[in-house]
Amino acid sequence: METLFDMHCHLGFAPSPGVTAKDGAAAGIGAFSCTVEPAEYERLQLILASAPNVALGLGAHPWWIADGRVGETELARFCELARTTRFIGEIGLDFAGPRDTEESRALQTSAFACILAACNESAAPLAPTNPEGATATSGQNRTCIATTSPEANPPGEGTLTRSATDTAPKLISIHAVNAAAAALDALEQASTFALHRVIFHWFSGTSDDLHRAVKLGCLFSVGPRMLASRRGREYARQIPLGQLLLETDMPARAGDNLPAEVWRAELNNALSGIAQLKGIDRAELAEHIASTSRELLIR
């Protein structure tokens, strides 16, 4: 069974996150599970401590920042915890609907800058990468794809790194709704691209934003909901192979179950959809995406 990696999910929303993670491992699923606030992260640290197939992200979701559930105290705790992990997510900006006000934009932007600064403490510059090389769909010039086969380190073998060394680059999952350009500006201003690896979850910015993000070396996690829109499908087609990842963003809300067969089916649907859009073999795509995911998660 091929290993599939869900690079943006929310196991903390499941009624029994530990059981969901264990069932996912048995189904050949590895995961980057994001959180929405530091308290959730700390709770899940204990619950998922024995889940070798899950990397847990420290998060401060922009919705929670905008409505005050993540305030100054929670942000201070985020900054403390950021020194102890290299997995960050979900963080970002959301300027849609009720959050599209001058006050909310200012609050979110200030918090995002604080979060990015905290991520940079003790970080060392990344080795240069070549995003342009990632555009190849053959085996050449894909600098960000590991050579390990998808079956070499299955999720259940304890291979995902959980904590950071003083200089470890972080893996950061970004939420940006009506705010892709602003998020890219903030990430550039914080030198995030020189220090860390950035994943845009369910990218929904403009075409210019996408091209800018690709050139900056961003990765993009793509799931069935992104592929449900014409723009999402076109973006998935355009994203270079070496910068593509899978996601489900599931469970969608607190209390929802995520059976392993549903979880794997969602990832398979995304994989098949992307393969069709790009006109490449599904198995080849699966190998490339699994290798990229493993390189990001395993240190």
Please name every model-derived segment.
Residues 1-299:
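Mid-domain alpha/beta scaffold segments of enzyme catalytic cores
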